Every structure is written in C-alpha cells, then in structure tokens.
C-alpha cells in the first residue's frame, strides 16, 4: 500500500465518523459559499461536482456539521444548486446555456420566442437547428444578468401602453 493510499483511507474514515445530517437548500448554499470563500482565487464550486452532476457533500461536511443524507445537483454553467427531485433542471440548464451561447456567437441574436415578454428561450428552434439534442419539458428564460439561462419566469416588465396617462385637467 502506498503512502497516498493511507491518507485517502484516513480521509474516508474521518468522513464516516461524521454524523448524518439533513440540511435545507439554503443551508447547503451557505456551506458552498463558505467553501468558496476559503478556496484560492479561481477555484469555484464546480470542483465539488461529481461526474453525475451531484455535489460531493463529504468535502463540505465541516460546513454542514456532518455529511448530508440527501443528494444535491449543481449546474456547471449557472452555478445554481438543486435538490434531488429537481435534478433534471441543472442538466437542461447546462445544455441550453451552451446552446444559447453558441447561437448568440454564430448569429449575433438571442434565440428568444418571438414577442416573448419574458425572454423565453426558443428551445424548439435551437433543437431544429441542431444546437440542442433534446427539448426540455419546461420553459427556460434568458436573464438580463450576463445572458444566463434560468428556469424561473422573470417578473414581466410593465406594459408601456397600459401606463399611459389618460387623465384630464379641468380649467
């Protein structure tokens, strides 16, 4: 057995000694932020990501007070964290974000559904033009923050026509 193997085994034994904890999504987000603050510049939460997209929770156990008994997933492109029951969201966010970026780079336009007040991504068009291999089962939107894709419907901007002043002044 190598010296490196001894260290790895010890790390696994230490993790097994930690209690199992049930954490909220907000508690996990705070733990991930603490982890990022303590890392060197240029290192972000994606280093916690396993191949299946889930977070390597034993690596942040010290911030949680134990090893979480749940599974959480991370979007590599948007850095958002999701509970296990929402694991399809980060999968689609990542693929659609890359497709939107590619489409924007090639055409100079955003792939938005025509007349969409919410900047809904036109996933059908991205699929038809081979930017996507599948269409998500839910709507996605482009935010005004660095053209990031989100699954949350933004608040609609007020309709300018509806706000026209139709009052009269009597003299």
Predicted regions and their residues:
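Short acidic linear motifs
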Residues: 1-171
């Amino acid at each position: 057995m190598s010296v490196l193997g001894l260290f790895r085994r010890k790390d696994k034994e230490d993790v097994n000694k930690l209690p199992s904890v049930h954490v909220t999504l907000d508690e996990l987000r705070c733990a991930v932020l603490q982890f990022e603050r303590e890392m060197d510049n240029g290192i972000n939460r994606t280093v916690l990501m396993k191949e299946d997209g889930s977070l390597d929770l034993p690596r942040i156990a010290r911030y949680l007070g134990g090893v979480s008994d749940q599974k959480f997933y991370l979007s590599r492109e948007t850095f958002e964290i999701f509970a296990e029951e929402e694991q399809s969201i980060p999968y689609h966010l990542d693929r659609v974000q890359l497709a939107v970026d590619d489409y924007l780079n090639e055409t100079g336009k955003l792939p938005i559904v025509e007349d969409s007040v919410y900047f809904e991504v036109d996933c059908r068009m991205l699929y038809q033009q081979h930017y996507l291999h599948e269409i998500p089962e839910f709507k996605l939107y482009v935010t005004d923050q660095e053209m990031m894709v989100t699954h949350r419907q933004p608040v609609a901007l007020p309709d300018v026509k509806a706000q026209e002043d139709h009052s009269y002044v009597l003299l």
